[in-house]
Amino acid sequence: MLVTPARDEAAGIVETMESVIGQSLHPVRWVIVDDGSIDDTSALVNCRISGLDWITLLRRDSAAQPGDFVSKVHAVRAGVRALEGIGYDFIGTLDADISLELDYFKRLFRAFEQCPSLGIAGGHVIEAYDGRLVPQRVSANSVAGGVQMFRRQAFEDVGGLRPMRLGGEDSVAEILARMRGWQVATLFELQVRHRGRALSGSARPTRAWFARGLVNRSLGYAPLFQLSVSAYRAAVQPPYLVSGLAMLAGYAWAALRREARALDPDTVAFLRAEQRRRLLRAVTRQPEPVRCAG
């Protein structure tokens, strides 16, 4: 099962649809949720799904603005509700600006088959902009929110996606899944194309990185880990230096204001224990744990 939240995606949603429709193994059902578009998104989707009874368009009235993370989660939830009563083993989200290789789902589900403890997985996002293809930098035990596929039991274990005012709902799902014993993995051998830039492609990238710092503080990132992440981003992520400093500033600002955590103390403790292990591996140059192969 697949759910795609879409708002004002007329410029590229047909390309996304073609990449799913042409799959060698396509989802049993795909719900595209128009989250209050004011462009031709719905008209284009309606035109393309004619005769394809496994794809449903769901219109949702919404006064959401671009970047409204809560509205996006509610759109996904509306799509999930539309699938009630239908048997399925996997459920995933796919952003409306993503294109997939034609054997993507076949290879993705093969990975789930080979690893019973794999709870969330997805391909490696490649950003296409300015005539370039730029791989997103992502941890091996994390998956970009726009391509997260859940084993059904893992999805139910974490309670689905949680509305987060600042964003980070995909990170919360991953943390809770790992806490419950599920593996989470980006499959680097599976590439997916994102049209344009993601976080770094904001019209105001400094503000976007500041916001990411706010999110990290709300999730309970340990100060030392956040400092190391900020230093890394400053070195490798355009705009260089500014990206890391802006992220650190967002984290510090939220800390000084004593902003409430989005996660409970036990979950924060689990996350920080993970982060300590990651820092230790980085210092001792140990490789990331490899996901199971069978």
Q: Model-predicted segments: where are they?
A:
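Short beta-strand-to-loop acidic/aromatic patch adjacent to the donor-nucleotide binding site
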Residues: 87-99
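Active-site nucleotide-sugar/metal-binding loop of Leloir-type enzymes
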Residues: 73-90
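Short beta-strand/loop segment that forms part of the nucleotide-sugar
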Residues: 27-36, 58-60
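Conserved donor NDP-sugar-binding/catalytic core segment of glycosyltransferases
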Residues: 99-134
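Short, acidic, metal-binding catalytic loop of nucleotide-sugar glycosyltransferases
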Residues: 18-27
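Non-catalytic, C-terminal membrane-associated alpha-helical segments of glycosyltransferases
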Residues: 208-294
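Conserved nucleotide-sugar donor-binding
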Residues: 144-159
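A conserved acidic beta->alpha catalytic loop
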Residues: 34-43, 98
